[in-house]
């Protein structure tokens, strides 16, 4: 069976970590080897860039374009050094976020032109597209409330409600325009979200469990 690149997307507080735990449980049950990773981050250099973007300790504003380029520098490291090699070896890759998050957060939220982001993906990631995107949709107010229970808000989580409304809109537009993305209502119970994820994976891997 050809390796798959599966990405979980969604706003902060949508429950991506929980969703990934369900994907892991499913793949392990079916004896499918996989690595689990995240963005921003995923490699040592990419994690350093993540810390700079999310927890800027310097008395210097990060411009929206700079934020995008720092995230993409980390994404190139992540893709070239971890994602692509694993897929070539026949290992499935499950990632908490990929380039859709840049389209939504830096594009929708920050207002960077989406064409610029697509160009980065085409030029530096060979136009890489996940085999499956599971988008967890949640109202930004509920998402931020959930995120605040986990810990102190990071630099992006402090961006404000309108930022997240714009971000959500781009996510939903991306799902509508994609043939390999499925939206799940993340406000539903954990049990219902788990059930839907298993059904999606059954269909994707052609399993009947």
From Swiss-Prot:
One Pfam family for this entry, by name?
Answer: Thymidylate_kin
Question: Which InterPro entries does its entry note?
Answer: P-loop_NTPase, Thymidylate_kin-like_dom, Thymidylate_kin_CS, Thymidylate_kinase
* Enzyme class, UniProt record, top EC level: transferase
Reactions accelerated catalytically: dTMP + ATP = dTDP + ADP
Q: Where do the annotations place ATP binding?
A: 10-17
**Keywords, comma-separated and alphabetical:** ATP-binding, Kinase, Nucleotide biosynthesis, Nucleotide-binding, Transferase
Question: Recorded E.C. number(s)?
Answer: 2.7.4.9
Provide one Gene Ontology cellular component: cytosol
Biological process terms in GO annotation? dTDP biosynthetic process; dTTP biosynthetic process; dUDP biosynthetic process
GO terms for MF? ATP binding; dTMP kinase activity
| Similarity remark | Belongs to the thymidylate kinase family.
Please name the PANTHER family in this protein's record: THYMIDYLATE KINASE, UMP-CMP KINASE 2, MITOCHONDRIAL
Q: What does this protein do?
A: Phosphorylation of dTMP to form dTDP in both de novo and salvage pathways of dTTP synthesis.
**Which HAMAP family does the entry link to?**
Thymidylate_kinase
For this protein, the record's NCBIfam families field holds: DTMP_kinase (TIGR00041)
Q: What is this protein called?
A: Thymidylate kinase
Q: Which gene encodes it?
A: tmk
């Amino acid at each position: 069976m050809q390796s798959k690149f599966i990405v979980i997307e969604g706003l902060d507080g949508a429950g991506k970590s929980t969703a990934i735990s369900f994907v892991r449980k499913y793949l392990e049950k079916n004896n499918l080897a996989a690595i689990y990773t995240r963005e921003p981050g995923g490699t040592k250099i990419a994690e350093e860039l993540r810390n700079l973007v999310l927890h800027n300790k310097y008395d210097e504003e990060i411009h929206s374009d700079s934020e995008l380029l720092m995230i993409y520098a980390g994404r190139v490291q992540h893709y070239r050094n971890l994602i692509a090699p694993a897929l070539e070896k026949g290992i499935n890759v499950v990632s908490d976020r990929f380039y859709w998050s840049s389209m939504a957060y830096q594009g929708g939220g920050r207002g960077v032109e989406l064409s610029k982001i697509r160009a980065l993906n085409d030029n530096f990631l060979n136009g890489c597209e996940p085999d499956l995107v599971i988008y967890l949709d949640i109202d930004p107010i509920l998402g931020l409330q959930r995120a605040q229970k986990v810990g102190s808000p990071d630099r992006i989580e402090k961006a404000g409600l309108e930022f997240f409304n714009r971000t959500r809109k781009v996510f939903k537009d991306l799902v509508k325009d994609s043939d390999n993305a499925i939206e799940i209502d993340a406000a539903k119970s954990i049990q219902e979200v788990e059930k839907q994820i298993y059904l999606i994976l059954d269909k994707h891997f052609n399993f009947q469990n």
